[in-house]
């Protein structure tokens, strides 16, 4: 599997701060590049903390990119992936409610509240990058874009 890590940092190395508001580091040009990068992948992974803080939909909004994916026999939206240790995810999050995508949640807990909105892949122990890759490969994912915060990035770099 091809795995791409996507993140932005400040000049002094910060990914984010501890404020409740999202720290905007990227420029509009950066976001255009991120959207092109998203379009070239099968799946996108963001951690549960990102979902709770930012409530992203993780969609491709560019009509040309969506049409190109359709022409290649792909769904217009990327497969969405997240992981949670705490299980604190609401089925009303945009991750679950917006777009036409497969959705996978890797969790250390059973999450019956997500039945019908995502496939929950339970872990017997801790969630690892290797286990995520193995399960996603079984589901046909060949190119994974990881838009992680520090914890998720560390997991995939270890």
Q: Could you say what each language-model-derived stretch is?
A:
Residues 156-158:
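Short, intrinsically disordered, charge-balanced linker/junction segments flanking boundaries
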Residues 2-142, 151-154:
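Active-site ligand-binding patch in enzyme domains
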